[in-house]
């Protein structure tokens, strides 16, 4: 999940008034804030799920509400996964559109390395998980895509904390990798985790989607017009059997990424001149705080609560081949996939690593990219179902993989930061960080 550029001034007509609301919005849009809130929600869920309040937590998580006639009588946890995460995927759709139309993915030669890295970090972990679970039966193999996603909120937070001395292009590489990764994850969910499709609701969903697309192309950004259209599209996609978060992506991709006289936002720049920004930027500024500050942490709170059952319960989960496959795939598979694919593609004519980077930097980043959480838990729920025999194993595997990847990647990047700092000052570089 990539946050909008905080350096760009906020266009007018923002729904948040200046003052506390605007400051809160900027705070929630920061790279580190989303990761911290996600961590707090995860820890809180784990503590409550293993406390005397565990029964209350399960009752709240399983409480069902919503209009039954529209097939929207969902549990609280399902509303978080299907509803709130649609906001997260809407922001992802905005970022995909921006990067492919006007960003770093527009130039094929520049995009080749992170695209190859993203492909490697999906293929290699999926292969490792499959190999480990070959003898566990077809049910276990349904989770092959769990280690295929990176939680960019956590990953960027780690880089922001330990990578202040690293070249800025490393963060750009991570963000570009995340954009492609999000696209692959969306495709996997749509293709492999859709049980059956009801074509009538799916065709009906094209109506609000088309109206939404026409309106935003004409520069309409009134929330009271666009939000009802988005909700209608979401409900119809949900009724079709396709995971409802795909509606969020589709809506984001419909927003124009180039500022025009009709579809753009005008504001006065620092030099007093009027400037125009694309609607993707406008919507990302408004929805990113809601995504990182509310949608993703709430989803994490209702998804990460696993009852460990003491040391014996933890040991039991860790002996499950699903958990082992997830941990090894997240930690080793992603690092091998990203670094290996990048090394291979960098040998092609016209493609090379940025001169300010070294391959040890990419290796450290590849471990940080092993931090999978939001989409990994979502795929786990789609693969096995909430409350299934593998449910706890998925959560334990994802959490341990996240922690291990963060520690290894954070340590490597901190050492690389020391190397770059010493190199910039022309000082002797300690052997431990070369």
Swiss-Prot record:
Compositionally biased spans, kind Pro residues: 1-15
GO cellular component: plasma membrane
Membrane-spanning intervals of the chain: 34-54, 74-94, 112-132, 143-163, 173-193, 196-216, 222-242, 245-265, 294-314, 326-346, 362-382, 393-413
Domain of life from the UniProt record: Bacteria
Catalytic activity: Na(+)(in) + 2 H(+)(out) = Na(+)(out) + 2 H(+)(in)
Function: Na(+)/H(+) antiporter that extrudes sodium in exchange for external protons.
Name of the protein: Na(+)/H(+) antiporter NhaA 1
Gene source species: Clavibacter michiganensis subsp. michiganensis (strain NCPPB 382)
Designated gene of the protein: nhaA1
